[in-house]
């Protein structure tokens, strides 16, 4: 189980970029795994099943945060006299990245966060979690071709976002 705990935590951290939120999601995932173990049909590997639960929990959490921010913004429109800060800029909290690279990594994660949900999921699972495209397709319940397309669009969208920040790198291609 320790292997799966690291897998779940690291995946959640890559999606959420906050240690405390990743820890909460990790707990939620294992509660769901425990409660749903009898429903596991072995049509995929246990790790793929756990990844799918993790990704779904992370996406649900991100959706809830967006709703909360929108609600706070709308509340602020109707009650501007409350001097409350409604949408705090999230701080970057990702271990293992050297200090001098932190700013660049922060821009990258902000750009990843702005991707459409399905592109973000495919990108994180491929480039950060380093899963094979076939497994990503199983996790996302789509075809390998669809995953390839999502990855291409994610890369193009990230390039556009990062070129806004680093215009001097516009002509560089990896």
Language model features with spans:
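Internal acidic/polar
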Residues: 68-98
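Short, charged helix-capping/linker segments at alpha-helix termini
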Residues: 9-28, 144, 166-174
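Arg/Lys-rich amphipathic alpha helix in sigma70-family domain 2
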Residues: 38-41, 55-73
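Sigma70-family region 2
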Residues: 14-18, 30-45, 64-66
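Short, Lys/Arg-enriched C-terminal cap helix and immediately downstream tail that follows
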Residues: 63-66, 115, 120, 155-173
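Amphipathic, Lys/Arg- and hydrophobic-enriched alpha-helical face
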Residues: 1-19, 36, 112, 161-164
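Structural recognition of an alpha-helix C-terminal capping motif at a helix-to-coil junction
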Residues: 10, 24-31, 44-56
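Helix-turn-helix DNA-binding module
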Residues: 106-146
């Amino acid at each position: 189980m320790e292997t799966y705990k690291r897998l779940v935590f690291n995946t959640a951290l890559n999606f959420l970029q906050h240690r405390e939120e990743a820890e909460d999601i990790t707990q939620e995932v294992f509660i769901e795994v425990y409660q749903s173990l009898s429903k596991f049909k072995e049509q995929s590997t246990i790790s793929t099943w756990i990844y799918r639960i993790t990704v779904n929990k992370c996406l649900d959490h991100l959706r809830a945060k967006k709703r909360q921010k929108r609600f706070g913004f709308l509340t602020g429109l109707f009650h501007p006299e409350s001097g409350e800060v409604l949408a705090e800029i999230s701080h970057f909290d990702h271990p293992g990245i050297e200090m001098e690279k932190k700013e660049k990594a922060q821009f990258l994660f902000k750009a990843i966060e702005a991707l459409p949900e399905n592109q973000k999921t495919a990108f994180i699972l491929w480039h950060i979690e380093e899963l094979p495209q076939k497994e990503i397709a199983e996790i996302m319940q789509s075809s390998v071709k669809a995953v390839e397309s999502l990855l291409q669009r994610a890369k193009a969208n990230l390039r556009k976002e990062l070129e806004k920040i680093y215009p001097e790198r516009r002509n560089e291609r990896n």
